[in-house]
């Protein structure tokens, strides 16, 4: 079937130069959790933690949700005390279109801040769903992994680790656009707003769902 397609579309294929739309890289590595059903070893989480902790100068982490257990909080502590400048950006609770993610961020904020991680909350027009990391000037990581218990222990997930200065520069530029729509949450819970962002506010519907989950369903946070 493939050969027939190529033969039938020879003129289209011949006129396309993949090199014009691609970038040479030094190396690409695929990170994956196991594919079995049920609980899994946190392979991706362990690898991402190691990569971030070993950053020489900087690391930027973007994730839609932060839902951690004690092991994951300890990993954030390791990141926070590394020599590199590390930031973690996620949706603010009112801006999060996942009610479990919103409820958990509010409830666990003291625990997140206690790790010492430099936390930023995104308040753009729509909820942010980027799952990406840039490290130093050459490593870019992107894929399906959320920084939550489900991605860490239940779902398979995939992340690409790309060694390329050009890809890193592109990713950093894209990520910075979102960071400029976020506010910095300080260790005491107060906020700094260097980009004069208009912070998202709860709609009545989102606030009601968030409150219901906090009161009745917080025990199920690892399944969402």
Give short role names for the model-derived ranges.
Residues 1-224:
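Charged, low-complexity intrinsically disordered terminal segments
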